[in-house]
């Protein structure tokens, strides 16, 4: 019963969660090489450009895997029920992308700082997203999990398209005006 899935508010919370957050990951994935090239002059084909991207995604990979372990730690060590443990972990992960606001300023110290900070932000996002997927199993019977996952994946794809299309349009508009892009006191091309 595909259409019956839409009768549950849990389905809609998953759809909204994927729609608004998947684009963040694709933004990091798509724009990180251009960021290192435009801001620091390291093309993605250069040794340093490759090292920065590998560092960023190594941090994302290792820490996002830990993100799957944290809720279990809350359940096993703190005695929380699985859903509460997952929600607490997701709250913690939701704060990890915030330091990305300082990545541009930290780049004045070393180009490695933005790679590390953006890596931490990406790891927080991916850990949050992995736990969001796990909530489906907490809320729905086995027969509905694939359907809900597919619906959320589609919503995430549409949200990602809109976020990245909008980001590209803003960057192009700013460049056409000859203006620097400014955000919270930080300035870039």
Residue ranges and their predicted role:
Residues 83-132:
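C-terminal transmembrane helical hairpin of 12-TM major facilitator-type secondary transporters
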Residues 137-174:
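A late C-terminal transmembrane helix in Major Facilitator Superfamily
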Residues 16, 20, 55-58, 92-96, ...:
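Hydrophobic residues within alpha-helical transmembrane segments
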Residues 41-59, 84-88, 112-116, 147-151, ...:
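Loop-to-transmembrane helix entry
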Residues 7-68, 121-133, 137, 160-164:
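Extracytoplasmic gate region of multi-pass secondary transporters
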Residues 36-37, 70-71, 75, 166-175:
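Interfacial helix-cap and linker-helix signal at transmembrane-aqueous boundaries
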Residues 2-8, 45, 82, 106-108, ...:
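Helix-boundary and loop/linker segments of multi-pass membrane transporters
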Residues 82-88, 168-188:
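A membrane-interface helix-boundary motif in multi-pass transporters
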């Amino acid at each position: 019963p595909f259409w019956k899935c839409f009768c549950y508010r849990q389905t809609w919370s998953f759809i909204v969660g994927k729609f608004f957050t998947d684009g963040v990951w694709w933004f990091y994935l798509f724009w990180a090489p251009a960021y290192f090239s435009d801001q620091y002059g390291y093309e993605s084909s250069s040794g340093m450009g490759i090292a920065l991207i590998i560092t960023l995604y190594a941090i994302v990979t290792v820490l996002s895997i830990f993100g799957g372990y944290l809720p279990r730690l809350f359940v096993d060590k703190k005695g929380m029920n699985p859903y509460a443990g997952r929600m607490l972990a997701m709250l913690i992960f939701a704060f990890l992308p915030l330091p990305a606001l300082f990545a541009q300023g930290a780049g004045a110290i070393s180009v490695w700082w933005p790679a590390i900070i953006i890596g931490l932000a990406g790891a927080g996002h991916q850990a949050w997203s992995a736990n969001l997927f796990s909530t489906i199993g907490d809320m729905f019977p086995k027969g509905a999990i694939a359907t809900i996952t597919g619906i959320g994946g589609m919503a995430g794809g549409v949200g990602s398209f809109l976020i990245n299309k909008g980001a590209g349009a803003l960057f192009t508009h700013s460049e056409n005006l000859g203006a620097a892009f400014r955000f919270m006191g930080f300035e870039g091309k």
